[in-house]
Amino acid sequence: MQNLYIKTYGCQMNEYDSERMADTLAVSHGLRLVDDPVLADVLLLNTCSIREKAEDKVFTQLGFWRPFKERRPEVVIGVGGCVASQEGERLRRRAPYVDLVFGPQTLHRLPDLLDACLAERRPQVDIAFPMLEKFDHLPQRPGRDGATAFVTIQEGCDKFCTFCVVPHTRGREYSRSMPDILREVRALVEQGVREITLLGQNVNAYRGATGLVGEGGLADLLERLARIPGLLRLRYTTSHPANLDDELIAAHGSIGILAPHLHLPVQSGSDRILRRMHRKHTVGQYLDKVDRLRAARPGIQISSDFIVGFPGETDADFAATMELIDAVRFDQSFSFKYSQRPNTPALKLKDSVPEAVKEDRLAVLQGRINGLAQGYAQALVGTQQAVLITGPSRRDAQELTGKTACNRAVNLAGSMDWVGQMLDVEITAALPNSLRGRAALVAPTSQRLAV
């Protein structure tokens, strides 16, 4: 048994979890990550249950893998993540060729589950919620060759929005200890990482491992991270408006390396719908926090998530959402049609919105958001932006790509020696999904990627 293949669905936290699965099995079993599932001895599917038909997507993928198992019975197939947590034994009954089923909070038990599967010759299922165990058993991350990295600092959510499965699949809010986070980030920076994105389902609810008053929240953590030599940029996602406190707003003005971009999901511009969603904030409270963010950090860009067609959403409710979009002028937001998710309170709500109406509203909303985003991109043409070069462009391996502070992708000509540097880049063109630029100044050697 030598090769491991992992396919990941969903958010950045799942990407982080997949990295840790690979790290864990590399240490415990010497498994090497490969890009081709045909070569794998162990295939893992890390799943997401946020959107409609998530379960169907999982079983379709497992169907693609089933022939590997039929040709080589010794191949191990595992399913992790939120669909695994949600389905448990039902997943095994529908796909009996699956050997491992594990939840987001038990990925650290993968070595034991794999050993038991091989020794006992029978499937293993573990979808418990031992939050403390997961953070206490994260392996040391091996050397990296990239300029950016994700670091999970918080998991779960206590907000219980009526449309959301997260509390049922990831559990209640739990924060990682600050010393552990600082150690991991220092190690990553020593390996050459220059930008860190802190992750959590409700990341600004971070309160340290004990949750005691005075231990330090997200603002305190950001201040400590900003002192690490060599770290050039910080981000965090995803935030809940109810937990965006005064200290965190002030941090956007005082911490220079904190990116002037915040993803702050609002979901709807109607107070009536926000109440039905159990969002724990009003439109007015949201606007007040946006105003204070922009006062603390002029030029900060705000992106959001929107759900259209939530049960009971009227034309007036949708119009209120469009008014909010115009008022805030969101940048690069995500929007979705409401879909029923298992075990959520919204399943009991009546007054469902017809599918055709959902589609029409989504098209209108996305058109407005895309127009605002393109207008902002066009306004960057002719300006100089600090761009962290992250590697070769996916479209053209002879070019480089990087990110602006406001999270815009920029492609430019240059040398691979620039990877890991923060460059001043003149923006020369705005394309639908990216910017083009020209390097104006190469950063000093001290800012280059360690190799």
Swiss-Prot record:
Residues 378-441 form the TRAM domain. It holds the Pfam family UPF0004. Its EC number is 2.8.4.3. [4Fe-4S] cluster 1 binds at residues 11, 48, 82. InterPro entries: Elp3/MiaA/NifB-like_rSAM, Methylthiotransferase, Methylthiotransferase_CS, Methylthiotransferase_N, Methylthiotransferase_N_sf, MiaB_methiolase, rSAM, rSAM_horseshoe. PROSITE patterns: MTTASE_N, MTTASE_RADICAL, RADICAL_SAM, TRAM. Its cofactor is [4Fe-4S] cluster. GO terms for molecular function: 4 iron, 4 sulfur cluster binding; metal ion binding; N6-isopentenyladenosine methylthiotransferase activity. Binds 2 [4Fe-4S] clusters. One cluster is coordinated with 3 cysteines and an exchangeable S-adenosyl-L-methionine. It is found in: Cytoplasm. PANTHER family: CDK5 REGULATORY SUBUNIT-ASSOCIATED PROTEIN 1 (PTHR43020), MITOCHONDRIAL TRNA METHYLTHIOTRANSFERASE CDK5RAP1 (PTHR43020:SF2). Monomer. Catalyzes the methylthiolation of N6-(dimethylallyl)adenosine (i(6)A), leading to the formation of 2-methylthio-N6-(dimethylallyl)adenosine (ms(2)i(6)A) at position 37 in tRNAs that read codons beginning with uridine. This is tRNA-2-methylthio-N(6)-dimethylallyladenosine synthase. It comes from Acidithiobacillus ferrooxidans (strain ATCC 23270 / DSM 14882 / CIP 104768 / NCIMB 8455) (Ferrobacillus ferrooxidans (strain ATCC 23270)).
